[in-house]
A protein has these predicted regions:
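Conserved N-terminal entry element of GNAT/NAT acetyltransferase domains
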Residues: 1-9
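Conserved active-site tyrosine of GNAT-family acetyltransferases
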Residues: 17, 110-111, 115
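A conserved beta-strand-loop-helix scaffold within acyl/acetyltransferase catalytic domains
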Residues: 32-35, 43-45, 52-61, 66
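A conserved beta-turn-beta hairpin within the catalytic core of GNAT-like acetyltransferases
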Residues: 56-64, 73, 125-129
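Conserved acetyl-CoA pyrophosphate-binding loop and the N-cap/start of the following alpha-helix
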Residues: 72, 76-84
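Conserved GNAT acetyl-CoA-binding A-motif
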Residues: 89-102
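Conserved catalytic-core motifs of GNAT/GCN5-like acyltransferases
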Residues: 98-100, 116-132
Length: 137
């Protein structure tokens, strides 16, 4: 056996490790069927100007991305996306939501909607903070 260290991760190597981990996890998880959830707002030209990407898995909705373009910020667009995602998650049987956000992103936004900070990473990546939130639906 040989130990290799790299700063350039090849897709094939990443896929091999991911597939090994996935096989291990699927043998142990009770719910093996995560379902993607994408909600997009498009302009008249079909360009995405705001959107939500997450996944529902068992009791949980995991929020991966929630983004609103500059021109739509502070007009209720983010709230609309979040409410819709939570509604769909409930319909899918979810009881909780989990997300992470940086200090310069939207912690106050999520707190306004009942999300509670579970923990935070200080000095991430250098001087900022990364927060992890949970909400009971």
């Amino acid at each position: 056996m040989e130990l290799e260290i790299t700063e350039k991760i090849e897709k094939q190597d990443q896929d091999t490790i991911f597939q090994g981990l996935l096989k291990y996890n699927l043998a142990r998880l009770e719910d093996k069927n995560p379902v993607d959830l994408g909600i997009y707002i498009r302009d008249k030209a079909g360009k995405i100007v705001a959107g939500f990407i997450g996944v529902t898995h068992g009791n949980w909705l995991s929020i991966k991305y929630l983004w609103v373009s500059e021109k739509l910020r502070y007009k209720g667009t983010g709230s609309q996306l979040l409410y819709k995602a939570e509604k769909i998650a409930k319909e899918r049987g979810c009881k909780y939501v989990f997300l992470d956000t940086f200090s310069f992103q939207a912690p106050k936004f999520y707190e306004k909607f009942g999300y509670h900070k579970v923990f935070s990473l200080e000095n991430y990546p250098l001087t900022g903070k990364r927060y992890y939130y949970r909400k009971i639906l």
